[in-house]
Amino acid sequence: MSAPGGPLARLEARLTREWQRRGALAWALTPFACVFGLCAALRRTAYAQGWKQPVDVGVPVVVVGNVTVGGTGKTPTVIALVDALRAAGFTPGVVSRGYGANVKAPTAVTPASRAAAAGDEPLLIARRTGAPVWVCPDRVAAAQALRAAHPDVDVIVSDDGLQHYRLARTVELVVFDHRLGGNGFLLPAGPLREPLSRHRDATLVNDPYSGALPPWPDTYALALTPGAAWHLDQPALRRPLSQFAHERVLAAAGIGAPERFFATLRAAGLAPATRALPDHYAFADNPFVDDAVDAILITEKDAVKLGASWRDARLWVVPVEAALDPRLIALVVEKLRGRSPA
């Protein structure tokens, strides 16, 4: 795990900037992008032509993923989708890779799990939804284990895994933030894992800056709204963000797109100092000990990694709620109910 401000973190920051334009570095990397694109196309073709067969796990699967590198808002989208499916009469479960955790076999994630053993995003999903959550690099194995343990589950939501073609899916939802496809180049010349033209059932765009939607078919706005902050040591203690406006505040985030979190706080009227930590930052020690501030605002995804040994009375957690377009929910429900039994 790269340290804050370390060489890897600086490289990540530079690539993120370069991926938003077609500069000299992007053009220099295009030969490698062509090789990457060819390999990705061969994998897609193998399943499209039937040379490889996806595995049907016996219930419909909704994949929430992205075609770009970095955070786009998938985790709050998964949480909102699980709640929406439950409200529509389904019994959803969730599978995830468990990125950042040492997971080799299908593993159940409960609210009492540790982030180091489950992954920060799956643990957050388990705590927020109460749905069965299983993790494994092999999402098919995770889905099969989930179904065996919870036979009442009638739909599985895959947190990421858009490129995990071995898992048969009924619906694919692709999430973008304001950066969309960046410079439009594939890795490593750009941020794209697959071409922007890749088929999907619907596109969700979270743009806290302009709110504009690209002219793509079946595209819906994704609104991420912060709630009242809760105290890390005393979760029942809550404060609206407006109460931090006249305090010395540091906002810190170890997520794929930390600037989006900072922009959310600014939109709420705050002017915090900011610190971008590497995605999935482990918090082996306290990086805030030398910060002379009254309050430190962090994300829920970071909060699940802070165990009982953490004692910093300045830490407040800012939850984020995703609001899904009712038309999108109706589209997903219609596709799920129209699926033929396996």
From Swiss-Prot:
Enzyme Commission number(s) from the entry = 2.7.1.130
For whether the record's keyword set contains Kinase, the answer is: yes
Q: Which residues bind ATP?
A: 68-75
InterPro entries named among the record's database cross-references: LpxK, P-loop_NTPase
* Major enzyme class: transferase
- Residue stretches spanning the membrane: none
Quote the pathway field: Glycolipid biosynthesis; lipid IV(A) biosynthesis; lipid IV(A) from (3R)-3-hydroxytetradecanoyl-[acyl-carrier-protein] and UDP-N-acetyl-alpha-D-glucosamine: step 6/6
**May I have one GO cellular component term?**
plasma membrane
Q: Which reaction does it catalyse?
A: a lipid A disaccharide + ATP = a lipid IVA + ADP + H(+)
Any idea which UniProt keywords this protein has? Answer: ATP-binding, Kinase, Lipid A biosynthesis, Lipid biosynthesis, Lipid metabolism, Nucleotide-binding, Transferase
Q: Which Pfam families does this UniProt record tie to the protein?
A: LpxK
**What GO biological process term is on the record, naming one?**
lipopolysaccharide core region biosynthetic process
Tell me if Amino-acid biosynthesis is a UniProt keyword of this record: no
GO molecular function annotations of the record: ATP binding; tetraacyldisaccharide 4'-kinase activity
Q: What does this protein do?
A: Transfers the gamma-phosphate of ATP to the 4'-position of a tetraacyldisaccharide 1-phosphate intermediate (termed DS-1-P) to form tetraacyldisaccharide 1,4'-bis-phosphate (lipid IVA).
Under the heading NCBIfam families, the entry gives: lpxK (TIGR00682)
Family named by the database record: Belongs to the LpxK family.
Task: Specify the protein name.
Answer: Tetraacyldisaccharide 4'-kinase
Q: Which organism's genome codes for this protein?
A: Burkholderia cenocepacia (strain HI2424)
